[in-house]
Structures are given as C-alpha cells and as structure tokens.
C-alpha cells in the first residue's frame, strides 16, 4: 500500500470510473469503515443522499425446472416452501397499491426459466393496471424472454431484472441447467432494445474474493442500470445450505458483506447499487452501515423469506440522515 498516497488515490480513480481489478483487490485490505467512508464520499460526489426503495411480489412460486443450488424454489432442491401458480392480476395490483406509500419501484417476480404465453399476457395486463392506477415504476423478473416480449416491455417502460448471480468462472458451481452466457445474451438483447436492466448477484455462495470482484466488473461491462446485491440466506433443503452445514463453504460475515458492498459501489460509481435479500440475516445490527454505500434498498418480503417491518427500515433511513423513497 506504500506506493499510494492514501485513500484519496482510490477516491479519485473511483469518481473517474477508472478503478481496475488490482485496485479492487487492494481495497479489500482496507478496514470496513474506511471502505464505507470512501463509498459514501463517491455517493456524495454524485450528489446522492437518497436511498431509493423498491419492493417485489413473488407472483408465481416454486416448481422451477432450473437447478440453482441456492434457490428454495428449485425442483432439484427439497426446501419446504409455498408453491402456487401465477397470482391473479387483482392480487398483484392490490400489493402494488399497498406498497406505493413506501416505495418507488414494484417488481413482479415469477419462478421458472421463462413464462408461457398465458402467463406473459396476464403479467402484461397486470403491468398495465399498475401503470394506470399507481405512480410506481414497474420492474419485472420473468426469466429469459424473446425479442418481441422485450420490445413490448420496453413500450410499457418496464425495467427488466435478470441476475447474473455470480461470476462467469463460478457459475457452473451453482447452476448447470442454463448458462452464464444465456443470461448475458438476454441482458445484451434487452439493452440493445433500449430497456433498463437491473442485474446483480448473490454474495456468500462459496465464491472467492476474485470471483466476487469479477462479477462486479462483468456487470460494469454489461452497463446495467441497477445492481441488486443479495447476501445468501441459508434455506434448509438447498444444496448451498448443505455445503454450509457440512463446512464445505464458510458463512459470509457482516464485515465481509459490508466490504463487498462498498467495493461494488466504488467499482460502479455511477450505477444504482441496491441491497436486497439476506441483509437481515447476515448484517443483523450492522444493517444501517450499509446505507453509506448503497443507492437503494429492497423493503418488504422477499421471494420465500420474510423481510423486516417496513416502518423499521424507513426509520433506519431517516435516523441515518438519508432521504428515503
């Protein structure tokens, strides 16, 4: 570290969007509080004191054909969860109306590699109703979509969500029924059409620091607008849970998670880094510190796990001096 004049070196490179992988590895050696301070300085450089709030509805749960090792909705895992087909559009609209008083964004999320024609058309109807009856920005996580579907979603001003989940070199350790390149192809197609894309991953799946940093740079190369960071929440019955239970991989620590979030922001200074699932379980009493480095927060319940009380999250944001919603 002696070759650098101090943390100002990293700050200057970050605001110029010029941090390289060597810089990112060196950043890891800094204390978590220094990294959070740096990330917050970068946020303030971009005149951002805001924490943009989003929420999701698990509109179709379980029975997924894909074998993602971390996912409780996969048929290849044995987790005990609620399974149900696509919810009626009335239920989706009801949830959207409820969350509007707290959130800017609302995402319709479904299980599965993709949606069939009937499901797709029903989701389109639900999106139109939400657009008509609320002021929410609408997002959708519908798996791998074709060109015509993406164009229709673009016309409706919908942001697409499609997580890479992890880096290219680690992807086949967590999923083999579809590929990393399948995801990249879908994201690239969406970007080419002009859609905004939210794509991030899950940290704490047993990946190395190098894997994690590579994921952040892969997202940077794809030029996605939003980067949701999830922290793996062990759910019994998933293969990743068994790896943790057998000590084949280590549980991520709160400090490791905070450092990863801060480094992500420093690598992607002009993008919206959003903290999502697993924060309650993994960060515990350290959750408020994450606000220094993030641009957005997912509130409410997640896919198959509960979030914490929304009012508590709002209070945390206000108490920290941040602007919410």
From Swiss-Prot:
<comment type="function">
    <text>Catalyzes the conversion of dethiobiotin (DTB) to biotin by the insertion of a sulfur atom into dethiobiotin via a radical-based mechanism.</text>
</comment>
<dbReference type="InterPro" id="IPR002684">
    <property type="entry name" value="Biotin_synth/BioAB"/>
</dbReference>
<dbReference type="GO" id="GO:0009102">
    <property type="term" value="P:biotin biosynthetic process"/>
</dbReference>
<keyword id="KW-0808">Transferase</keyword>
<dbReference type="Pfam" id="PF06968">
    <property type="entry name" value="BATS"/>
</dbReference>
<feature type="binding site">
    <location>
        <position position="68"/>
    </location>
    <ligand>
        <name>[4Fe-4S] cluster</name>
    </ligand>
</feature>
<dbReference type="GO" id="GO:0051539">
    <property type="term" value="F:4 iron, 4 sulfur cluster binding"/>
</dbReference>
<keyword id="KW-0479">Metal-binding</keyword>
<keyword id="KW-0949">S-adenosyl-L-methionine</keyword>
<feature type="binding site">
    <location>
        <position position="274"/>
    </location>
    <ligand>
        <name>[2Fe-2S] cluster</name>
    </ligand>
</feature>
<dbReference type="GO" id="GO:0005506">
    <property type="term" value="F:iron ion binding"/>
</dbReference>
<dbReference type="Pfam" id="PF04055">
    <property type="entry name" value="Radical_SAM"/>
</dbReference>
<comment type="similarity">
    <text>Belongs to the radical SAM superfamily. Biotin synthase family.</text>
</comment>
<keyword id="KW-0001">2Fe-2S</keyword>
<feature type="binding site">
    <location>
        <position position="198"/>
    </location>
    <ligand>
        <name>[2Fe-2S] cluster</name>
    </ligand>
</feature>
<protein>
    <recommendedName>
        <fullName>Biotin synthase</fullName>
        <ecNumber>2.8.1.6</ecNumber>
    </recommendedName>
</protein>
<feature type="binding site">
    <location>
        <position position="71"/>
    </location>
    <ligand>
        <name>[4Fe-4S] cluster</name>
    </ligand>
</feature>
<keyword id="KW-0093">Biotin biosynthesis</keyword>
<dbReference type="InterPro" id="IPR007197">
    <property type="entry name" value="rSAM"/>
</dbReference>
<comment type="pathway">
    <text>Cofactor biosynthesis; biotin biosynthesis; biotin from 7,8-diaminononanoate: step 2/2.</text>
</comment>
<dbReference type="InterPro" id="IPR024177">
    <property type="entry name" value="Biotin_synthase"/>
</dbReference>
<dbReference type="InterPro" id="IPR010722">
    <property type="entry name" value="BATS_dom"/>
</dbReference>
<keyword id="KW-0411">Iron-sulfur</keyword>
<feature type="binding site">
    <location>
        <position position="139"/>
    </location>
    <ligand>
        <name>[2Fe-2S] cluster</name>
    </ligand>
</feature>
<feature type="domain" description="Radical SAM core">
    <location>
        <begin position="46"/>
        <end position="270"/>
    </location>
</feature>
<feature type="binding site">
    <location>
        <position position="107"/>
    </location>
    <ligand>
        <name>[2Fe-2S] cluster</name>
    </ligand>
</feature>
<feature type="binding site">
    <location>
        <position position="64"/>
    </location>
    <ligand>
        <name>[4Fe-4S] cluster</name>
    </ligand>
</feature>
<keyword id="KW-0408">Iron</keyword>
<dbReference type="InterPro" id="IPR013785">
    <property type="entry name" value="Aldolase_TIM"/>
</dbReference>
<comment type="subunit">
    <text>Homodimer.</text>
</comment>
<keyword id="KW-0004">4Fe-4S</keyword>
<dbReference type="InterPro" id="IPR006638">
    <property type="entry name" value="Elp3/MiaA/NifB-like_rSAM"/>
</dbReference>
<dbReference type="GO" id="GO:0051537">
    <property type="term" value="F:2 iron, 2 sulfur cluster binding"/>
</dbReference>
<dbReference type="GO" id="GO:0004076">
    <property type="term" value="F:biotin synthase activity"/>
</dbReference>
């Amino acid at each position: 570290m002696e070759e650098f004049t101090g943390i100002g070196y990293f700050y200057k490179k970050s605001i110029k969007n010029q941090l390289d992988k060597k810089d990112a590895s060196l950043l890891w050696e800094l204390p978590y509080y220094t990294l959070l301070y740096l990330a917050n300085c970068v946020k303030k450089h971009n005149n951002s004191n805001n924490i943009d709030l989003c929420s999701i509805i698990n509109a179709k749960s379980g029975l997924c054909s894909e074998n993602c090792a971390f996912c409780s909705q996969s048929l290849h895992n044995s987790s005990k969860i609620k399974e149900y087909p696509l919810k009626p559009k009335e239920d989706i609209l009801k949830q959207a109306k409820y969350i509007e008083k707290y959130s800017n964004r609302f995402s319709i999320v479904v299980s599965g590699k993709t949606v069939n024609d009937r499901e797709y058309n029903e989701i389109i109807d639900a999106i139109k109703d939400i657009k008509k009856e609320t002021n929410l920005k609408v997002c959708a996580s519908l798996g791998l979509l074709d060109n015509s579907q993406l164009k229709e979603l673009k016309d409706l001003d919908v942001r697409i969500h499609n997580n890479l989940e992890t880096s290219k070199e680690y992807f086949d350790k967590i999923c083999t029924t579809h590929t990393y390149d399948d995801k990249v192809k879908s994201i690239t197609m969406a970007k080419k059409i002009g859609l905004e894309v939210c794509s991030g991953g899950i940290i704490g799946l047993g990946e190395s620091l190098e894997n994690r940093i590579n994921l952040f740079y892969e997202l940077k190369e794809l030029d996605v607008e939003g980067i949701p960071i999830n922290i793996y929440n062990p759910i019994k019955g998933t293969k990743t849970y068994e790896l943790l239970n057998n000590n084949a991989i280590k549980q991520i620590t709160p400090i490791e998670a905070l450092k990863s979030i801060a480094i992500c922001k420093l690598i992607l200074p002009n993008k919206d880094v959003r903290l999502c699932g697993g924060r309650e379980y993994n960060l515990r009493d350290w959750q408020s510190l994450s606000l220094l480095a993030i641009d957005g927060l997912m509130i409410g319940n997640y896919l198959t796990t509960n979030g914490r009380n929304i009012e508590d999250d709002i209070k945390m944001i206000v108490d920290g001096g941040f602007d919410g919603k």
